[in-house]
Amino acid sequence: MKHILKFTFFFVTLFLFSCSNNSGKGNSVTNNLSEQLLEQHPQHSSKFISDATKKVQQLINENKYTPFDVLQSQKLDKIEENSEVLVDVSTPNKMNGNQIYSYLKERTLLVGTSYLCNRCPNIHLNNASGFVIHEDGVIATNYHVIEVKEGMNVSGLFATDHEGNVFPVVKVLAASQSNDLAILQVDTGGKKIKALPFAEEELMGSDIYLMGNPFGNTFLMTKGIIGRKFISERDGELKIAVTTEFGPGASGGPIVNTNGQIIGMVSAIEMKFANNHSRQGGVQMILKEAIPVSVLNKYVKGN
């Protein structure tokens, strides 16, 4: 018996960089690694999510969203399709952890479905993660984030940036259940949003940073390395094992290298028990699984 827990995350950041070779859109440069970027306005996570939920309710009341069943039909039509989205493949200058945090926070999103519960008349919002891959409102997240939830009255799908701007998901551009990824179009109302550039390949042992919203802790960043590339026993697809911490709410979150390039996307965890697959032996290890950028690149186009 496999104990796989899938999670959802979301992030966004604040900082301008230029690139060392190409200057990518929204990626400005800083050569000063000693520069300190202070968090001027720490977030109150529950208030942030509550405010986002109110904005979602308003969009639904004004019928400014795409119904979830329409998105599901689109998803089925886009299984294993290339999104045809032209992504940035430039290489920004290396950054330290402080700079990466601000950079990631501007480019990460809280992604979640809106739903009605059976205890009150209010809209609720599931918390997951995603990230921007094109400035015109194209984002990436996990397939399981946009799956139909059994027994839930789901109305729509929404993405929220770190400033609290809420964008309805209006179209599914590509989806892969086996690779647990989805590429979506959101309506930004004409607003340009900063995107993450894509690396060509994931490098074993390299330092990485991850951002997400585990357990409702919005825009939480963790650090680790890529520990392994492997073929999953569960689905036969290529995955990477990472040592960055994450939990429920971080699914779909971006994983970047020290240049701020996407090298993977959060997907799942697998608990390993002392007594084989029996919980009686106690948890001995938790493997963190991510989708490598070499897989993500199959669903986009590089410029």
Predicted regions and their residues:
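Sec-dependent signal peptide recognition
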Residues: 2-10
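C-terminal motif of bacterial Sec signal peptides marking the signal peptidase cleavage site
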Residues: 16-18
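Bacterial signal peptide processing site
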Residues: 20-22
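N-terminal activation segment of mature serine protease catalytic domains
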Residues: 25-132, 299-303
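Active-site region of chymotrypsin-like
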Residues: 106-123, 187-194, 218-303
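Catalytic-histidine neighborhood of serine endopeptidases
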Residues: 127, 134-178, 204, 279
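Short, surface-exposed secondary-structure boundary micro-motifs
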Residues: 144, 213-214, 268
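Serine endopeptidase catalytic core focused on the charge-relay Asp
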Residues: 154-156, 161-162, 170-231, 256-259, ...
